[in-house]
Every structure is written in C-alpha cells, then in structure tokens.
Amino acid sequence: MQYQVDTHTHTVASSHAYSTIHDYIAVAKQKGIRLFANTDHGPAMADAPHFWHFVNLRVLPRMVDGVGILRGIEANIKNIDGEIDFFGDYLKQLDIVLAGFHEPVYPPSDKATHTEAMINTIKSGKVDIITHPGNPAYPIDIEAVARAAAEYGVALEINNSSFEVSRKGSEANCTAIAKAAKEFGTILVMGSDSHVAFSLGGFARAQAIIDEVAYPPSRLLNRSPSALLTFLAARGHETVADLIPLFSDDEPCC
C-alpha cells in the first residue's frame, strides 16, 4: 500500500542529510507521494540550519509538478518544561511543527523526566507531532503520553527510520505506543524520517505495527493529504489554507 503523505523529511540544510527539495519532489512524483513536509532539524542541533532557514521557508512554492510541500521543522525538546528551539510568532509562519528528543540537545536521563518533558511539550500547544517517541534511549510512561496526546490533539509518530537506520530496539515501544493510541483515541502518523530522498514514503516497518495492532485507519494522518491538512488547520495553522483547496477531491488511500 502506498500512502500519499510523508510528514518527516530532512534536506541538505541539515548537513547529515543528503538530498535537496528538488530531489524529494522527483522521488515523490515517482512514488505517488502527493504531499510531504520539509522538516529540517531545529537550530539547537550542531549541524542544523540557521534560524533564518525556517523564517525564509515562505519562499518555497506550495505545489511543484503536482506535489505539495509543507514548510516545517523538527524542533528539539530542550528541557523538562517542554520548551523547544523555535518560538513566538515565527511558529505561526510554519505549516507543521514536529518535536522530539535528540541526544546532542537534551541527553537522556530517566523515565519520569522524559515523560514529564514530553507531556509538557504536548501541553504547550506549539507542537503538532511528537517524533520517534519509541526511542529506547528515552523510556517514557507510554500510557500517560498517549492519554495526554489524545487530550491535547497532538499526534504521535511511528518512525520508520527507527527500525532501519537509528534508534535500534524501538519495535516493542512503538508497538506499545500504537496499542495505547488505539485504546485512548490518540492520533498516529507514520514518518519516514528520510535523510535521503530515496526513503521518502518508506513506511513498511511502521505499517506492519499499525496493522498488527489493528489501529483504525480513520485516525492515521497519512491516509490522505486532506486528512493531514484538516488536522493542521484545526491546530491553528492558518498557513495551510491555500493548500486545502488543492486536495479537496482526494480519496483516502486506505
């Protein structure tokens, strides 16, 4: 099954990634991806783009050759208070805000601290999707996080890269997250976390977990471009208003 939406990609602006926006568009056309988010690492990461990179994302076209582009960021959770490394009115210029734990910015500590930091990030209202919450380096109280995400309308990511490239040992945690999300009504999204365009839309391992727990397709943000855009608009991203009409006739892939 080919999903048409990918919410998590990195370009050469993050210097440990290897593809340009043009590369992603070309691969998206080949694979039938209709909408993807450009979400380079937040500026607190050592090799992340400069702050101005995110401010200037408005120069990106909305649509190129039938492929929609979301202007976003994968911000870094900085502390137990759930603060991230992007702020203020600049957040309103973005279409989508992801955030997660990254060792160079917020080193692992203990389960209680990780849980409090993640829940505070969810409660902040600044973040739409929590990335790779199944990372075994950052154990969390999965049920507490899933409940908070459901309450505040924040999506949890099942990160496909965690099974193939990094964060090895994530399978059990991600399965538990998917089960908790099913139980508590939490929104899920699959993210490729592509650092090279060839893996855009690669969700095979994440999809296996979604299928294993019989998570409802109606709550999966990848199901259609309009599903993701409606979610983002409901979360206050007025910037997606000009994209919504371009996908008004789409049909869920599943």
Swiss-Prot record:
Q: Name one GO molecular function term.
A: phosphatase activity
Sequence positions that bind Zn(2+) 2: 16, 41, 195
Q: Which domain of life is it from?
A: Bacteria
Gene Ontology CC terms:
cytosol
Q: What does the entry comment about cofactor binding? A: Binds 3 Zn(2+) ions per subunit.
Which SUPFAM superfamilies does this chain map to? PHP domain-like (SSF89550)
Signal sequence bounds:
none
Q: Does the keyword DNA-binding apply?
A: no
> Which EC number(s) are documented for this chain?
3.1.3.-
Q: Which GO terms describe its biological process?
A: bacterial-type flagellum-dependent swarming motility
Q: Which UniProt keywords apply?
A: Hydrolase, Metal-binding, Zinc
User: Keyword Zinc: yes or no?
Assistant: yes
User: What are the required cofactors?
Assistant: Zn(2+)
Top EC category: hydrolase
- Which amino acids does the record list as binding Zn(2+) 3? 74, 102, 132
Task: Identify the residues that bind Zn(2+) 1.
Answer: 8, 10, 74, 193
Similarity remark: Belongs to the PHP family.
Query: What name has this protein been given in UniProt?
Result: Probable phosphatase Shew185_1467
Task: Give the species this sequence originates from.
Answer: Shewanella baltica (strain OS185)
